[in-house]
Amino acid sequence: MIMGIDPGTLVSGYAIILVEQRYKIRAHSYGAIRLSSKDSLTQRYKQLFQTLSGVLDNVTPDAVVLETQYVHKNPQSAIKLGMGRGVLVLAAALRDIPVFEYTPNVAKRAVVGKGNASKQQVQLMVSKILNIPDVLNSDCEDIADAFALAICHAHTSAYTCLGVR
């Protein structure tokens, strides 16, 4: 099982896939952690940690995959996102779940075939690969990105070394 997470300070999408064979992948579960902009950052980080911890207490993936931090035009936004990513990494690390990172371009290439694919193209391909029409909804972009990260990891040698073929 692989969990992909598309981190955000207001919405973090997560998606868990089952890899039955190297190219036979099924969706297990998915969702979005939606936080209120009215809450303080401290409260949001706490809620993010508690919600993801609850998911990880129910399902223990072999790996957690995050989108790598990118340089943001606004340094404050990058710092806030980095802190949120840290909370997500901690939730996995406390359960001894290995954490991997991929750039958005690598994840898009794994799913769509090109690194500069639009969010809609990622949604469409994730929907087709996993047969999940819900992912096409406009409020599911973060979930589709999380699935793309998980699928990307499933196609790497790092995951096949875990014994899944």
From Swiss-Prot:
Keywords: Cytoplasm, DNA damage, DNA recombination, DNA repair, DNA-binding, Endonuclease, Hydrolase, Magnesium, Metal-binding, Nuclease. SUPFAM superfamilies: Ribonuclease H-like. Its cofactor is Mg(2+). Mg(2+) 2 binds at residue 67. It is found in: Cytoplasm. PROSITE patterns: RUVC. Coiled coil: none annotated. Mg(2+) 1 binds at residues 6, 142. This is Crossover junction endodeoxyribonuclease RuvC. The lineage of its organism: Bacteria, Pseudomonadati, Chlamydiota, Chlamydiia, Chlamydiales.
